[in-house]
């Protein structure tokens, strides 16, 4: 039987273990290990510098930039030990940029305020006033010097609006008018009395000629101007039947050739001439 080959002990130790590991620490006992900084890995000097050369260069550049800005490194950038966190350094760089942008905005706003004259107040928002700037009292009703028109608004019983205008006399006729005529009242002006009576007649409430109602959503007039309420006007327009004596428009269930229930006259259809 052939003996198994004995491993060569003269093989270099760096081929048996990676170069980044510390062979002394691996061969020593746990009791001989030195205390290390928490969160940091012990790496041999041979592997530390090639891996972190660029990071150390960037750190030195950032520290020089902070010193040029006149800011203390103790306030802006904490003192970094042998092991530093690149993420924390990037966050601090963002904070510095944010502070610089805020300072620039503050300076621009202060510069804009200085450009305005010191005595110029800020323009308030324009708002339309609800009342007149110089309100004046209206003319009295019995003022003899009033010239113009007076409008009188009244609501009819059928909820319609009626406007009655009253015009003042011209200046020429007013100057020729004697004081006695002005004091005489309505008796001295028969024309005014007639106009007043015509206005009072117009103020009388409308009444349906068929059902005698005074309230309806819509008034409908017949061909001769006779006022009819909405319901009676629709029936009269549809069937064309009414009493020739009292203008009673029968309901739908009342047949023609019947007598009027109000005056007894026959309800014949109206023949258009």
UniProtKB/Swiss-Prot annotation:
One of the record's GO cellular component terms: nucleoplasm
Q: Which SUPFAM superfamilies match?
A: Glucocorticoid receptor-like (DNA-binding domain) (SSF57716)
Q: Which InterPro entries match?
A: GATA-type_ZnF_Regulator (IPR053116), Znf_GATA (IPR000679), Znf_NHR/GATA (IPR013088)
| Keywords of this entry | Activator, Developmental protein, Differentiation, DNA-binding, Metal-binding, Nucleus, Oogenesis, Repressor, Spermatogenesis, Transcription, Transcription regulation, Zinc, Zinc-finger
Q: Where in the cell is it found?
A: Nucleus
Q: Which portions of this protein are annotated as coiled-coil regions? A: none
Q: Which Gene3D superfamilies match?
A: Erythroid Transcription Factor GATA-1, subunit A
Look up the record and give one Gene Ontology term from the biological process aspect.
Answer: oocyte development
- Renumbered to this chain, region (Disordered) spans 99-143, 172-201
Q: Which PROSITE patterns match?
A: GATA_ZN_FINGER_2
- What is the role of this chain? Transcriptional regulator that plays a key role in germ cell development. Determines the oogenic fate by activating key genes for the oogenic program and meiotic prophase entry. Acts downstream of bone morphogenetic protein (BMP) by regulating expression of genes required for the oogenic programs, which are repressed by Polycomb activities in sexually uncommitted germ cells. Regulates expression of STRA8, a central downstream effector for the meiotic program. Acts independently of retinoic acid (RA).
Protein name per the record = GATA-type zinc finger protein 1
Q: Which organism is it from?
A: Homo sapiens
